[in-house]
Amino acid sequence: VGAGALVIGAYLPSTGALARSAAPIASGAAALDANAFVQIGADGVVTVISKHTEVGQGVYTGMATLVAEELDADWAQVRVVAAPVDTNVYKNLAFGFQGTGGSSSVANAYEQMRRMGAMARALLVQAAAQSWKTSAQEITVQAGKIRHAASGREAGFGEFAALAEAGRVPAQDARALSAAYHYLQ
């Protein structure tokens, strides 16, 4: 009876510095940094910044689903990146430090990520209403498209990302009612 193994290791000294300094970058040139957790590129790609680490338990899918639901994003246009090291912004609300553990990720971030997606949607709706010179109440969002039924106008998220960047964050909670959900059941 015999056994063998090949183990190869490497030391990458710059990895830690890179993790501390690199901020997630949205895929488009004119991005909407709606908040610390959601960016929208000029190309319409929604980048969700996850404060929880993906180690095979599906955290990235969970974070993306929460944001996509509230934003009413096209799932094919959603991606997830790891949050940079910043405990003040990305801490686990249950533990007080930036980390993942104790099966707490989705429970910990559920309301927070929903609010962040809703905030991004509200900023896009405000931008569309401003551009189309109409009321925000007349604007709808569905599957990554912003629409004004009365005029027949329609645009993707990316078309309003830069204008939404200058918008004011809505004072009231804009989260969707669960009856309107597509991804969360």
What kind of region is each of these model predictions?
Residues 1-185:
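Cofactor-binding beta-sheet edge motifs in enzyme active sites
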